[in-house]
């Protein structure tokens, strides 16, 4: 039963979500947000790296998924988001995990059926698929959505291998 850590990187808040099982029978393990302190950006990246390293040690996933960067109108924001992604990827690779990356559109397509779904639709599907009592916070929900997308992709790849394709 694969266990996947999904990460929705951010320069102020990074969402995480751990799921296990299969694309057709996923189970919620943990989710939440890493809130980064104010202060020098390199210090915030260190906090993010350490927090994710602790989550990796605690939950022991078999793979990680990091949402890809969207194009921003603000170059400084895009650079900071890219650096946060880098800290997240380094934490995962340092723990020996393979890291998959999906665009927001690919994640929405896997969960909702079309790549232009709204945040509310994605949150609803995360809640339904994982049988949660409430819709998770947006950043944690996005991370869970990324992990669910990867479970779905892993199921599809396994089916193709079994079919000899």
UniProtKB/Swiss-Prot annotation:
Write out the catalysed reaction: Endonucleolytic cleavage at a junction such as a reciprocal single-stranded crossover between two homologous DNA duplexes (Holliday junction)
The protein's matches in Gene3D superfamilies, at most eight in alphabetical order, are given as:
Ribonuclease H-like superfamily/Ribonuclease H
Q: Which GO terms describe its biological process?
A: DNA recombination; DNA repair
Which Gene Ontology molecular-function terms are recorded? crossover junction DNA endonuclease activity; DNA binding; magnesium ion binding
The kind of enzyme this is, by top-level EC class, is: hydrolase
Arranged from A to Z, the UniProt key words for this protein are: Cytoplasm, DNA damage, DNA recombination, DNA repair, DNA-binding, Endonuclease, Hydrolase, Magnesium, Metal-binding, Nuclease
Keyword rRNA processing (UniProt): no
Q: Where does Mg(2+) 2 bind?
A: 67
Cofactor binding summary note: Binds 2 Mg(2+) ion per subunit.
Q: What is this protein called?
A: Crossover junction endodeoxyribonuclease RuvC
Provide the species name: Alkalilimnicola ehrlichii (strain ATCC BAA-1101 / DSM 17681 / MLHE-1)
């Amino acid at each position: 039963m694969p266990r996947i850590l999904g990460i929705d990187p951010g320069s102020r808040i990074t969402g995480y979500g751990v799921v296990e099982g299969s694309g057709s029978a996923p189970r919620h393990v943990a989710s939440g947000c890493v809130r980064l302190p104010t202060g020098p950006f390199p210090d915030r990246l260190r906090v993010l790296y350490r927090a994710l390293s602790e989550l990796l040690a605690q939950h022991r996933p078999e793979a990680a998924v990091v949402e890809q960067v969207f194009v921003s109108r603000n170059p400084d924001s895009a650079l900071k988001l890219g650096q946060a992604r880098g800290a997240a990827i380094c934490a995962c690779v340092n723990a020996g995990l393979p890291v998959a990356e999906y665009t927001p559109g690919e994640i929405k397509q896997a969960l909702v059926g079309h790549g232009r779904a709204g945040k509310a639709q994605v949150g609803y599907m995360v809640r339904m698929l994982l049988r949660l009592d409430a819709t998770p916070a947006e950043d944690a929900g996005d991370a869970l959505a990324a992990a669910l997308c990867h479970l779905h992709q892993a199921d599809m790849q396994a089916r193709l291998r079994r079919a000899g394709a």
